[in-house]
Amino acid sequence: MLLLAASAAGYAQKPRPEKLDRGLVVARGNADGSYFASWRLLATDSPSISFTLLRDGKPVKENITGATSTAVEGKPTSRWQIVSLRDGTAIDTTKAVLPWQQPYLRYHLQKPSAGKDYDYTPNDCSTGDVDGDGQYEIIVKWEPTNAHDNSQDGMTGPVFLDCYKLDMTVPANDPKRLWRIDLGPNIRAGAHYTQFLVYDFDGDGRSELMCKTAPGSRDGRGNYVNQASDSKDIRLADNGRDWRNSRGRVNGGQEYLTVFDGEDGHAINTIYYMPNRNTGYGRDAPGTFQWEPKSRSGDNGDNGNRGERYLAAVAYLNGFDKAPCAIFTRGYYTQAFAWAVTFDGKRLHTNWFHESRDKEQYSVTDSLGRKNTYNAPAPTSGSGSGTLFANGNHNLSIADVDGDGRDEMLWGAAALDDNGKILYSTGYGHGDAMHVADLIPENAGLEVFDVHEKKKEYAWDIHDAATGRIILKGGPEGIDNGRGLAAQIDSTTGAFYFWSAGDSDIRSAADGKVVSGIRLPINFRIYWDGDAQDELLDGVNIRKWNAGGSKLLGIFGDVDNERKRTLTARNGATGSPMAKGLRSFQRPSLSFNGYGNPASNNWTKNTPCLQADLFGDWREEVVYRDRDDNSTIYIYTTEIPTAYRYPTLMHDHVYRMGIVWQNVAYNQPPHLGVNLPKEIKSSRSANY
């Protein structure tokens, strides 16, 4: 068994990890009535820390120094605890938890009342510790069934945000709801509108929630959010007015940003959202601004497409020893704006405001209101936009890519430095998906795999996350490449591979060579079965790449009888470890069907409500809605043993920021800021 301590490189120059408890969970086994216990190792733990597992107050396994999970025997009424020991002396004992009685947790939620022609389903979720007890809560976005994409007309029902307790001490089917926020009629429902951030913004140990609001939005106490403003104009706005036009577009009225208390949901502070739909500040802002270039047909606020595309993230822009910033953006097909905001516990403040109104110049307004205009650097590809203009994706990522102790914002085909200035642009234009990780261990730092929707010369590229230097580029010319994935599917090499919808060949991130023509899922990656490689999460199935060809997953379901997909070897791949893995790939390797009635979200995106390391050891949990009962969600956790002891993924900064932005627009999976197989190889081994 391998003992993995967090490497100094992996956790240096990062924020202080959030305070979490051991996250002990005990779930019923698949068939024989046994249980599987799993708990957190923290990045702050000493490498010599050990654990004792208690059942009904008596030791079951003592001085555990290996993996923080184990199979155990018990009863449905057994109460379990973890004792943490330093040099053999107990330093902490967890609260007692009751076991799950299935290999999953079923939560019955309080669904909002249906409207005249629509109902509600749980959609994107997020997580944060809203009450400071070291346990995560879950925040659920309720999506009306008449939600629309920005390209579509139509009325929608209001969006609701709920917060529920995740209390593992008594895993009841009916969790306690802490609050509900009603965003009202003037926030349209759809994937591109409500991007909500759950994080501890003021450093008090409790998470807040931030999102875009409007007149008519109500907080967790039922009060209108505009009453939490210092602005008289905002407080006097008409909360009874419906600003939607006959096409269902919200083309007028004030637009706000509100920060909500995480524990009871009350609105703490509301300010004008920057920019408004006319790219100005405040007031009712009737939609007249042309978001398309003059050479094309107009897209103003009445049409509500280009100017209603939002993204959001959390980033440590002022240093990891300072409070984090919320970043809210508007537009990416053409004009693009990014607004960094801080929260001091009482008020929201602008950190900086970035404007990319064309391809050659951009401006940044600082916290004191001083605006400076800059010429953009030349795109690293040699052509295209040099600013955020037309270079954004339907998603974004956050990481300290240049090692200065401050985060940068990865925009797709461009990046912003911590001060709001352009770090670089590749010029490759708009894309649907991207992945930021240590894709190429031989290249210092992180890399970006970007999938291009813009019909240009290349369908994808990999570029250096710090400099924008193009490392690889390729794929069919002139296509709309809608989706792609980069993952470490072969732990024997520790290498990343990538593939996409428009270029399904599997390629090595190291050199771009095709290793197979087999088609793999292009949705999420996940750590599930306990090795150091990624599994592939697609809908409610986890698909497994078995490099040795010796094992298939079956803990949650039988392996599909579909014929094995045989490798079409190219570029000398025959006989390589990768090729052997391809030969043994079967699908699906694991299905959640039969364990509850789970369903994925967001149409062809096939995404879960949430994927995150919510509790237990370093493997990830998955949250799904019920296929038929719109009041129910499921939380699944792995019960497969692992040989590795590793800190909770939530203490990896890049990963934690990824959980915050996961709900944004076209959801993307989180990645680590370190190369996990490389971390394992560099860690000391021990025989346990």
PLM features per residue range, with description:
Residues 1-13:
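Bacterial Sec-dependent N-terminal signal peptides
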Residues 3-6, 26, 350:
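Generic detector of low-complexity/intrinsically disordered segments
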Residues 17-23, 34, 41-46, 52-56, ...:
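Beta-propeller-forming repeat regions
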Residues 27-33:
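Short, solvent-exposed loop/linker segments at the N-terminal edge
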